[in-house]
Amino acid sequence: SALLHHDTHYPPGSLVLEAGCGVGAQTALLLEKSPDARFVSLDISMPSIVQARRGTGEAISPVSFLQTNLFDLPFQPETFDHIFVCFILEHLTDPEGALLKLKSVLKPGGTFTLIEGDHGSCFFSPDSEEARHVWNCLVEAQARLGGDSLIGRRLYPLLFKAGFEAIEVTPRFVYADPSRPQWVDGFTLKTICAMVEGVRERALEMGLTGERRWETGMQALRRTADSPNGVFCYTFFKGVAIKRR
């Protein structure tokens, strides 16, 4: 959270839209960093909204949760002072259209914060064809569903094309090795390996892999965490821009 959110702050009283809040993981961090701002957090999934409400205690926090589609926003133009989007565009078939929809409800002078990963930025040791196979299954499965897990490198072009100004994109590099056990556990194992394992059934259904090859690949990928010389590197990208008009 510090890596991605240490420089995200909103002024007291400002109205912030969080588009694609999921189960509220980022919402909780936003509230922690800007306790006196007001948040509207939306997601297309009602089960996720229910979980987010439970996790943040909506009744006693300055956040309102809303189940809606970000391509059909129920807000007047120029409603929000700021907009925050994290790990959403990679799942969309039309990220350009999503940015334009969101921009329409942002006030002139307001900031737009956008965070995405880039699966093409992944490097690890021990490296192997087996480990790269399951990683590539993750990338290909998302691509076949219309998403783009390599979208991190496109943040600047996307924001520029949408008409934002004062665009600043910064890479947020993650490096995990045995000398940083908290990163090995929290990132390599519980984020990366868990994320790849989560696409197993879809990869099998799509014919991208077989069961034996998948298990061999996951064992190889986990060695980046449990090997005495295991290393995992990954880069997130954070873009902040302003709507002038």
Positions of predicted regions on the chain:
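Conserved alpha-helix/loop element of class I SAM-dependent methyltransferases that forms part
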Residues: 1-14, 29
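Class I SAM-dependent methyltransferase SAM/SAH-binding core
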Residues: 15-17, 23-73, 97
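A short acidic, Gly/Pro-enriched loop at the edge of an enzyme's catalytic core
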Residues: 71-82
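A short SAM/SAH-binding and catalytic strip from SAM-dependent methyltransferases
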Residues: 81-94
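A short glycine-rich, Lys/Arg-flanked "PGG" loop and its adjoining helix->strand segment in the class I
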Residues: 96-111
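Conserved catalytic/acceptor-binding region of the Class I
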Residues: 113-182, 190
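Conserved Class I S-adenosyl-L-methionine
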Residues: 168-245
